[in-house]
Amino acid sequence: LAINDGTLPSVTGNFPEVSRENRGLSVDGNLLSIDVIFPVLHGTYGEDGQLQSDLDQIGIPYVGSGAVASELAMDKAEAKSFFAKAGIAIAPGITVTEAQWKRDAQSVTDSIANLGMPLFVKASRGGSSRGTVKVKELSAFASAMEEALSFDSKVLVERAIDGAEVECAVLE
C-alpha cells in the first residue's frame, strides 16, 4: 500500500484489489496510483516468483529479480544445480525427498556421513530460514530432517562452509 501524508490507508472488508486498467490499487473503492512495487516479502508468494509473475502480467513495475529468477532462487536444490552447471563452486551436499527418507532413512544417513560435520539441513523451498537446522553431530540428523520435512517435501543437506556472506544488487 502507498504511504500518503505519512500514513497507510486503512484496509477493511475484502483485500485490496490491483487494477490492470488503471495501474493502481483499489482500497475501499479508492484508487491509489502505483509507480513501482517494492516487494518486501519473504517465502511463498513473496520470494517464489508468484508476485513478480502477477505484476508482470498486469504491467506494474517492481524492484528486484524477475519471476523466473525468483522461482529458481526459491528452490535451493534447483538453484544449486543451476550454479554447479554454470561452473560456480558449491558446497558438497545431497538432495533428499520425503519419499526417500521414509523409504530408507538409514541409507540417507549413511550417505551424508562423508560430508563431514557440521552440516546444514534445509527445506529446499523454505523461505526466511524456516526449516533450516545446523547439525553438529550425526545423532541430531534425523530430527533435523523431520524439522525440514515439516516445511517441504524436498530437503537439501550441505556441509557447512565458513565464509563471508556477500550480497550485491545488479541494475539492468
Model segments located where?
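ATP-binding N-terminal substructure of ATP-dependent carboxylate-amine bond-forming enzymes
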Residues: L1-V68, L72-M74, E78-K85, V96-D110
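Structured loop/turn residues at beta-strand edges in well-structured enzyme cores
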Residues: L32, I88, L115
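Hydrophobic beta-strand scaffold residues
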Residues: P61-Y62, I90, L119, V155
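Basic phosphate/pyrophosphate-binding loop/patch that engages nucleotide-derived ligands
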Residues: F82-I90, E147, V166
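Phosphate/pyrophosphate-binding betaalpha-module
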Residues: A89-V96, K122
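Conserved anion/nucleotide-ligand pocket segment
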Residues: N114-S143
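Phosphate-binding site of ATP-dependent enzymes
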Residues: V133-E172
